[in-house]
Amino acid sequence: MGLEKQTLRMGNGKDHPQPGDPVELNYTGYLYDESNPDHHKGKEFDSSKRRGPLKATIGAGDVIRGWDEGVRQMSLGEKAILTMSGEYAYGEKGFPGLIPPNASLVFEVELLKIKDHGLD
């Protein structure tokens, strides 16, 4: 599987985050469920909707590899599904209590801000 991106809503098509750029994202994370026809979304394990947008720096190791690579493919305002195998997520360690070792994950991600450029 590796990393796959499926666009749900197009962004502005011109502003893409680069390594070192701070970004703000809304997201919901799900365990991968092959039997679910809705983008293989399994059990929800986390969401920024309860805490507010996640702030991270692309390429700085702030987030999992699948996000570092997947979010760089997005443009400002885009909403996408990022589906990733375990090596792009939490790997052999998983995230105890939430994510099993080597688990594939599905994230619904919305890119709200790049550096100082936000949605109007």
Curated annotation (Swiss-Prot):
PROSITE patterns: FKBP_PPIASE (PS50059). Keywords: Isomerase, Rotamase. Residues 1-26 are annotated as: Disordered. InterPro entries: FKBP-type_PPIase, PPIase_dom_sf, PPIase_FKBP_dom. One of its GO terms (cellular component) is cytoplasm. Its EC number is 5.2.1.8. The keyword DNA-binding does not apply. Inhibited by both FK506 and rapamycin. GO terms for molecular function: peptidyl-prolyl cis-trans isomerase activity. Pfam families: FKBP_C. Residues 20-115 form the PPIase FKBP-type domain. It comes from the Eukaryota. It catalyses: [protein]-peptidylproline (omega=180) = [protein]-peptidylproline (omega=0). Belongs to the FKBP-type PPIase family. FKBP1 subfamily. PPIases accelerate the folding of proteins. It catalyzes the cis-trans isomerization of proline imidic peptide bonds in oligopeptides. This is FK506-binding protein 1B. It comes from Aspergillus fumigatus (strain ATCC MYA-4609 / CBS 101355 / FGSC A1100 / Af293). The lineage of its organism: Eukaryota, Fungi, Dikarya, Ascomycota, Pezizomycotina. The gene is fpr1B.
